[in-house]
Amino acid sequence: MSVEIREPVTGRREPDKSPRKIAGMFDAIAARYDLLNTVLSGGLDRYWRRKAIASLKLTGRERVLDVCTGTADVAIGSARRGAARVVGVDFSGAMLTHGLDKVRHAVLGDRIQLIRGDAMNLPVASRSVDVATIAFGIRNVQRPEAACAELFRALRPGGRLAILEFGTPQSPVFGPIYHWYSRHILPHVGRVVSRHDAAYTYLPESIGAFAYGGEFNEILGAAGFSQVQARPLMFGAVYLYTGVRS
């Protein structure tokens, strides 16, 4: 099946997401990345990842591809939930180094393989995996629509997709609180903890520019996925997207 690569539909101004810049940024914050996630989300990032993994209903036979695997939280969680084999892909070498340490500590090295690679050109064969996941990484890809097409290519027919990504809450009560936090508190705390000036200024900018909800569903549909759903979590601060390769 040929997949049409469409341009982003948001019309919002995109921050610089050149692969070299993004990889360098994550290399710089890798040592404190897990701590930052816990601090900035109040520990909710772990809950959201568990929700994504649970949505896949793993049976113990699946081959899982975790793209933008970072420090391998979803890869490890998938293996613990019964995935037979997990391949994690990321283009930040430092993030993968920390992920590998966690895989070894979890004694899952026989079932998890971490590979350096690009989400827009995945180093896996077509129709080779049963499940594909991305947690909080798709918005960092220079061309998210190309990454979605690659996920579709990698999945076998009937394969399942789960993507976690930040959104923009529209609640009249929670929305203003979230916007204030993301614009003022998050960048300041992120800079202090990460010791990196740009990374947590980039975070709210990338969230604000990214397609979410129905707009991202359109990107998944254009890549070929069916049964696409977007489930808002925490009033839409995060979305869980699911789909199937028909």
Q: What does each of the following model-derived ranges do?
A:
Residues 120-131:
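A short acidic, Gly/Pro-enriched loop at the edge of an enzyme's catalytic core
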